[in-house]
Amino acid sequence: MKKVFYPLACCLAAGVLVSCSGQKKAGSAQEEQSANEVAVSYSKSLKAAEMDSLQLPVDADGYITIFDGKTFNGWRGYGKDRVPSKWTIEDGCIKFNGSGGGEAQDGDGGDLIFAHKFKNFELEMEWKVSKGGNSGIFYLAQEVTSKDKDGNDVLEPIYISAPEYQVLDNDNHPDAKLGKDNNRQSASLYDMIPAVPQNAKPFGEWNKAKIMVYKGTVVHGQNDENVLEYHLWTKQWTDLLQASKFSQDKWPLAFELLNNCGGENHEGFIGMQDHGDDVWFRNIRVKVLD
């Protein structure tokens, strides 16, 4: 199916921000993709919410601190110009206050992004989840809108364009037993590559996450061990997508966006997932590698 891609005019200049009320779950998105040709646009971030990474402090190791433990400076909701109220700061951590309502809820919930696009980088943070908790860390994310059957703009979910580092209570969440070869457990490339070794700590304890992206090579680390590696924009990457829920047959739009992950410039946002459960993140820092 052919898709039409075009840049969206700056939302700030137009005084328009795409509403998250149009965000769809995977099933409805797939149904629309199979029925209609879809025009897709990369929703340009609001200029008022952009963050110049040069304004942020750099530590002795060369990392940019993108969360200062006190404020949401540089952060906003995915597809929004503010931080949704279910994301709070607690004891020096970013916390999502879950409601058990499932992923990317409208209104006061939704995913959180840092409003600066990174290209080649190393990302480090710590995370913990509540019992049975589920979340994720996204990278190279775009803000993508499509047209529904009536021609209205709808905001697509963040995971339609971004690889996901899974954040999960492996012992108590059913997703840990789904997928293939444990590829939905913590630190896995969600639904594609399992984390090996699987060394996650249980719910309520802090885990260390590390993601390196450099010229297409991606490495996931968990608790000071590298657990997987893959290569974007290669046949291997396309084959991984085709074997996943994001295949060309199952979800054409996701396949097209992820196969060209990061868009034309191979860069994108870092994000944290609202999956309806309590989750905490802290000590978030990024080293630019180019």
UniProtKB/Swiss-Prot annotation:
The reaction(s) annotated as catalysed by this protein in its Swiss-Prot or TrEMBL entry are:
3-dehydro-alpha,alpha-trehalose + H2O = 3-dehydro-D-glucose + D-glucose
Does Hydrolase show up as a keyword for this record? yes
Location relative to the cell = Cell membrane
Q: What class of enzyme is it?
A: hydrolase
Q: Name what induces it.
A: Induced during growth on trehalose.
State the phenotype upon gene disruption.
Deletion mutant lacks the ability to convert glucosinolates to isothiocyanates. Monocolonization of mice with the mutant shows reduced isothiocyanate production in the gastrointestinal tract.
The Gene Ontology CC terms held by the record are:
plasma membrane
Protein name from the UniProt record: 3-keto-disaccharide hydrolase
Lineage of the species this protein comes from: Bacteria, Pseudomonadati, Bacteroidota, Bacteroidia, Bacteroidales
